[in-house]
Amino acid sequence: MLSKPMELLRPSKGMINVHPIQRGGILTEEARKVLLEWGDGYSMCDICLEGRVDLLDKPPVKRFKEEVAEFLGMDEVRFTAGARHAKFVAMSGFKGALVVDSLAHYTTYIAAELNGLRVYEVPNTGYPEFRIEAESYTDVFEKVKEETGDYPAVALLTHADYKYGNLADAKKVAEICRDYGIPLILNTAYTSGIMEVSGRETGCDFIVASGHKSWAATAPIGILATTFEFAERVFRVSEVRGNWSGRAFTKKEVALFGCSPVYGLPLVTLMASFPVVKERVKRWKEEVEKARWFVEEMEKIEGVMLLGERPKNHTLMNFETPSFNLIAKKHRRKGYFLYHELKERGIFGVQPGMTRNVKLNVYGLSWEEVERVAEAFKEIAEKYGLEVED
């Protein structure tokens, strides 16, 4: 018996999407135009002479790689299967202890575990701002030295975290790392591609980026940028040789699985969107202004309070919403009521079932759209008897 056809249309079509992990990855018109052209499997390998996607001349991936390195203020770039893969590759060049901020994404921990690194966390300031203080890296470095006899092999800082959208002081952390001689990995999954990020200006040794989170590309694709100092270590080529066949793969980079598995839409959409990405980072100040205005409007609703640093320096935000949670306890749809109320008003992306907290992102929305989202929350609040300031 044939299986029932799967419904593959997105429920968010035509709505304002405020999903916290999707705003920076919404495709540009230029990227949408290449979807059908390059949709076939292995489509970028039509004329592959070097056995590595990053060395292709047609399409010009090799040149693009150089342009991305310049854009990020670094020397060498590789494309990876997401930011999680980029972190794994960066960590593969080190042994010993890794110091990470306590707001790091779970994939940071998994990448460390896969590389056999022992993880030490930098505490945050806790409720309600959860900030990472740069000086705390010094304390943890000394703790590692005291416990192990050696300073950490490498450190990682999440530039903007996925929980609260706090923007960490990368330059200050990099200065501390440089004083200790500890290389720094800067995870910019939620920053580079939507705001200006430069490795030379911050002083970091590695930049990890996410094409599908912040560079308007299809998933999965990440970027790892580094300096000449570390390129050979983390992009080391294969030395294996078959004992019977004598086969060797001397151009294949080990941590990249030989050839980065992004040969198709992820890479070509990244390339197509790049001219727009280079320009849009210059408008970051206005994006932050929208976010700050939105916070003011949301906090006019009874019981709603922003979590994370103030003022906002990023467009991803997390609100504590106990008043909506009280409504959910009495509503027949329980925690799903808010999701459905927003959907009826053309707003999509808030996690279904969640009313204790509301996490969203307004990056790339027009002022009119940001206002519509704020008004939708206010309307829902008033509908259920919550007070809303004028």
Swiss-Prot record:
Keywords: Protein biosynthesis, Pyridoxal phosphate, Transferase. One of its GO terms (biological process) is translation. SUPFAM superfamilies: PLP-dependent transferases. It holds the Pfam family SepSecS. Its cofactor is pyridoxal 5'-phosphate. It is an enzyme of class 2 (transferase). The modification N6-(pyridoxal phosphate)lysine is found at K213. Gene3D superfamilies: Aspartate Aminotransferase, domain 1, Type I PLP-dependent aspartate aminotransferase-like (Major domain). Belongs to the SepCysS family. This is O-phospho-L-seryl-tRNA:Cys-tRNA synthase 2. It comes from Archaeoglobus fulgidus (strain ATCC 49558 / DSM 4304 / JCM 9628 / NBRC 100126 / VC-16). The lineage of its organism: Archaea, Methanobacteriati, Methanobacteriota, Archaeoglobi, Archaeoglobales.
